[in-house]
Amino acid sequence: SERGCAYCGAKHVIGTPMKDVIHISHGPVGCTYDTWQTKRYISDNDNFQLKYTYATDMKEKHIVFGAEKLLKKNIIEAFQAFPDIKRMTIYQTCASALIGDDINAIAQEVMDELPDVDIFVCNSPGFAGPSQSGGHHKINIAWIDQKVGTVEPKITSDYVINYVGEYNIQGDQEVMLDYFKRMGIQVLSTFTGNGSYDDLRAMHRAHLNVLECARSAEYICNELRVRYGIPRLDIDGFGFEPLSTSLRKIGLFFGIEDRAQAIIEEETARWKPELDWYKE
C-alpha cells in the first residue's frame, strides 16, 4: 500500500514535500506510482513537487546487466527538462539496491559534470526497515549527514527556529508561520513541508528546533542537538488549547512570552464566538 515500506516512508512522507526539487526513484515504475499524489502537501511554487514525479523505470534487463547508465541518463534528462530546477533527490528502491547500483557515485559524477546542480541520495529501499517508519529514520539521518552545514543562511532575527515534522498538508503550515512571524521569529527552514532544499541545508544555524511530528522527524532533531547543540521543543499545533500551550512554550524559551500571549488573546477573541456556538 501507499504506507507500506521504508522507501515510501522516506520519499512519500518526508522527501517529496520539498518543493524546489526533482524527486526521482531509481527502480521499477510501480514504486514511483505508489508514492505520488496521495498526499496534499502543497507548495508556493505552483505545487511543482506534486505535479511531476520521475522514475528510471528499471526493467528485467537492468536487473541482469545493471542500471547505473540508465540512472545517469535519467538524471541529466530531468535537469534538461526543467532547467530552472537545480536540486534533485534520488531514492533507492529494492530493485536497484539488490543489484548494488552505486547511486552515490553516479550522483557525484553528475555534480562534477554539472557544477550548478546539487543532488541528495536517499538509500532507503523498501526492505530497509519493518515499515515506513524505518524510512523516516533513514532520510532524517541521511539529510544531516550529507547536506546540513553546506549552506550558510542570512540571519535576520534574534529568534531563529527550524520548524520540523510539519508537511503543509492542505496548507496547514501557513497558520503557524503567521504566528511565528508575529512573534518576531525567523523560520530558517521547514522540514519538509513547502521546504526549500537550500534552506534545509542551513538547519545548523537555528537556535531551536520546533518539532510537530515526533514520529517522523525526531531523529534529525536529536542529531542536531548532538552535533550542533540545538535544543528540541515538541509542540502540538492542532486544537485551541494545545496550540496556545505550544506558543507559550516557544515564547518562554526565547523570553518573549508577552508576544505569545498577545497572539493567544487576539486569536481567542476572534474565534471564541464561533467555538461557543458549538458548545450551545
UniProtKB/Swiss-Prot annotation:
Hexamer of two alpha, two beta, and two delta chains. GO terms for molecular function: ATP binding; iron-sulfur cluster binding; metal ion binding; nitrogenase activity. Disulfide bonds: none annotated. InterPro entries: Nase/OxRdtase_comp1, Nase_asu, Nase_comp1_asu, Nase_comp1_CS. Belongs to the NifD/NifK/NifE/NifN family. Binds 1 [8Fe-7S] cluster per heterodimer. It comes from Heliomicrobium gestii (Heliobacterium gestii). The keyword ATP-binding applies. Its cofactor is [8Fe-7S] cluster; [8Fe-9S-C-homocitryl] cluster. One of its GO terms (biological process) is nitrogen fixation. Gene3D superfamilies: Nitrogenase molybdenum iron protein domain. This is Nitrogenase iron-iron protein alpha chain. This iron-iron protein is part of the nitrogenase complex that catalyzes the key enzymatic reactions in nitrogen fixation. Other nitrogenase complexes utilize a molybdenum-iron protein or a vanadium-iron protein. The structure of the 8Fe-9S-C-homocitryl cluster is assumed to be analogous to the 7Fe-Mo-9S-C-homocitryl cluster. The gene is anfD. [8Fe-7S] cluster binds at residues 5, 31, 94. Keywords: ATP-binding, Iron, Iron-sulfur, Metal-binding, Nitrogen fixation, Nucleotide-binding, Oxidoreductase. It is an enzyme of class 1 (oxidoreductase). It comes from the Bacteria. It catalyses: N2 + 8 reduced [2Fe-2S]-[ferredoxin] + 16 ATP + 16 H2O = H2 + 8 oxidized [2Fe-2S]-[ferredoxin] + 2 NH4(+) + 16 ADP + 16 phosphate + 6 H(+). [8Fe-9S-C-homocitryl] cluster binds at residue 213. Its EC number is 1.18.6.1. Pfam families: Oxidored_nitro.
